[in-house]
Amino acid sequence: MFRLSNDEELDIQTLSSFISDHRFWVENRYKPLMDAYMTRYPIFDLPPKPEWKPDKRIAVNFAKYIVDTMNGFFIGIPIKIDCDDPAISEYVEFLDQYNDQDDNNAELSKMCSIYGKGYEMYYVDDLGNIGITYLSPEESFMIYDDSILQRPRYFCRIYEDADDTVYVSV
């Protein structure tokens, strides 16, 4: 967890340190978790055995089975939102349809099952509508204050463009 006291501003050195720590977490924690989900285990990267020895590398993808089964129970029936005010109910229905929230919620749930966390981001799109999407902890992280309440202070998203230029938005 990345923490910054309330009396400190986020400067470039601190942000660089957080990004470096985040990259460490991605390589050593998040990538192995996704590899387990995708059945990419280290045994498959070992050199082949001599031709006269059997080389049976079998993997049971129990991680994927557990994640998919539990998410089917958890979010298999889409979330239903009811409201007494018809105007609010109509807007919430529009938001759900516009952003395909059933799929977003299923993906976010799966992400949380794989990594232990995931992020939902709200934004205003180019048409002026509220957009909702999910972000993986491999590409984003939250910076909290150092209080007992751990209030969010900053959210960082790390992404690449088509030219492989890395950007960080805070």
Language-model segment annotations:
Residues M1-Y134, L149-Q150:
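Extended, helix-rich architectural segments
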